[in-house]
Amino acid sequence: MRRFFTILLLALMSVCAFAQRNGLVLSQNSPNPFDGTTCVYLAVEQAGEASLVVADVYGYFQTQWSQPLEAGVHKFRITLRAKGNYVLGAHHNGASGSVVMFCNIGGDANRIEYLGRVDEWTDEVYQNLTADDYEEEFVGYAKNKSNDQSAMTNNSSSFRVALSLSPFTLNQFDAGYTFQIGDRIATTPEELQLIYQSLGSTEMYVRLATKRHKTYKPDGTLDNTTDGKADENANVHTFDQVMTTCRIAAALDIPINPEVMCAYIYMDMDGTQAPRFYRDDYPELYATNATWRTILKDGDAQWSELSLEDICTVLEIYGEFVADSILATGCTVNDWNLGNEANFGFAGIGIGVPNAFDQTLAKAGPMKRYMASLFSLWWLKKHVWCYNAKQYAAVKRGILKAYAKAGKDTSNVRFSTHIATVTSTPRASASFFRYMADNGYAVDVAGISYYPSAPAMSFNKKKLLTKTVTRINKKCGVNVFIGEFSYPSQNMVGPFAGWNQQLGNYTKSQQGQADIYRDVIAWGKDNGLIGIRYWAPDYEGEWYPMSMFEFENKVGTAKQILTNHKEIVQ
């Protein structure tokens, strides 16, 4: 039901955004809220008389401006004398637009100042004008080891092809699955990953929850429930399974990219879950670390009761423990990913989750997830991202401690976080990574999920990708990695039934699936994309149309996208 609500809401928002287009575009003011003075941009398609008017929420006029404008994008500075909520209206050649502004502290007068024409009118401006477009380039990454502009124009030689066992693969082999690719048959995870490597894979992937062990029913079958409710992720991302996958990577001598969710079972754009650190799951930490034991009250503390400082302390200890354990398997880790589709929360601090220090979060409903990216990034910064930045930094510190303790070089170790694009705009995506860097967590690579067939805030899914990648490159100075990508070869069903939107000429067929994958890679290598992970290539379940295999009686037979994979990624 939650997934259906998400799909419906995104579709409605796309329709509403499309209906508002005309020959005038007014950006949201920035900053917003503001102290006395703020800036706004007005784009007009044709020359003509223009006017701006500011009124309070009761309709009382505050200030106005009018004069002829030529076609293009024009910048204005607005000053308001009193604290309050205001409406800014713009009119030009019969078209109009308005935005709501929030003034926290009054300025010295009420006035609108015209600062000049800053750009020409383009289709891109028409579709997505924001004040951030015309700010100075971000310099928060000036000393970042990944800030190499040449690397963001051509990544062909170092492009990451993350074709990997999925988090579900171990369970599928345990259930008796086999996989056939051409004349090769894989009966073990190691055999399947070796085939992936022969087809161009450069790294493996694993996703980690804080649940330590798989749980079973009395009859010996997996108990796929969490807190008494059915949960498809209940026995997929456990610590034990992660260690097994890391040992496979070590044996095959291929780097692995761990994704540390800091959630008990799972997290994504639809929900942020707190970690759980049961005493029976982490006996070594309770036995050896007094700080851990004290903060978590010997295993009895609730995450929602902890201060932000204590949460970060625990996360740092956990990050060190995780890195110690993963590195002890002998595997090579060049890239660490923190969180999964983490637009709206991480490690138990996010929209709709109770905590001890910001009650606004617990009261925020699901609508906030889909409206904030469009209309109130300031709210995400104030109530979500400010806390998450500290959490990410804490986990990173812990991981780096493990490297130092082991005497391992970290010059090639990179950190990333990936966010969902279906619930975001290019502006919001870049703002996320910029804000994190400004507040202590500068990623080396910016991660995104990109599902072209899923409902999103943008009708044009191709532009959603290209604008998101290039905007992050431009505003943040880092490459982008697509942490999740897939496209269906036939109609999706069940909870993913809404993920059936065809993109352009890419049909829902084996050919269309292979073609879009090829074209995204080809474009990305020349445009700031450093790699791609085809999500869950070997998973059946209700995901099978997205998979790289056709399934029958627990036998997976490779689709065209996989049999031709080596040529596709070259």
Language-model features, listed with the residues they occupy:
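Aromatic-rich peripheral "rim/lid" segments of glycoside hydrolase catalytic domains that contact
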Residues: 129-130, 134, 138, 183, ...
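Glycoside hydrolase catalytic-domain groove-lining segments
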Residues: 192, 259, 385-386, 404-415, ...
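Substrate-binding cleft and catalytic face of glycoside hydrolase catalytic domains
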Residues: 194-399, 403-406, 411-414, 420, ...
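Short, acidic/polar
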Residues: 178-198, 315-325, 425-437, 514-521
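Surface-exposed, proline-anchored Ser/Thr-rich loop/turn motifs
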Residues: 20-43, 60, 101-120
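Bacterial N-terminal signal peptides
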Residues: 7-14
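Boundary/entry segment of secreted carbohydrate-active catalytic domains
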Residues: 121-202
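Glycine-centered tight-turn motifs at strand-turn-strand junctions
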Residues: 26, 49, 58-84, 93-95
